[in-house]
Amino acid sequence: EGINNLKTVNDNAGIAPVEVDEAIIDLLNDCKRYHELTVGMVNPAMGSVLALWHEARDDGINDPAHAYLPDSEKLAEAATHMDPDAVVIDEAASTVYLSDPKMRLDVGAVAKGWSVQRVCENAPEGLLISVGGNVCATGAKDDSGTPWVVGIQNPDGGEEYLHTLYVTKGSV
């Protein structure tokens, strides 16, 4: 109780701005920047659309014989509520307001990598931090500058890596 997060913001869509921690403001500002950089491919405001897909996925997992795709009309309706400009961030007041009452935020495409990057920014030099597919190096492996070796797994399975990267500083 007393902690406001993205669920609280979503619950107050179209109702009132919600005071949030500075980290949420930073995350949402970065999400908006990623939206611009990717020409809309990353959109933190598409939670209403993603909720329909998540529901269909979960229902299919629980009852595979009755798996289904989300209704196209419901998807089209939800897609009218994903304008990132309707995410109103007031940094001075540390609030977030969704001006569209049917909009929902979903930062799943960004949050894990973003969080790992924040950890790495404050970590000592010479670490390799791996969190579920997001990898960040904070410096060379040793004093001689040896890079970390990061293997890119084949999403189709198999033992062989698709590619090997040599990283001293940065995220993969």
Describe each model-derived feature in a short phrase.
Residues 1-172:
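Mature catalytic core of soluble alpha/beta enzymes
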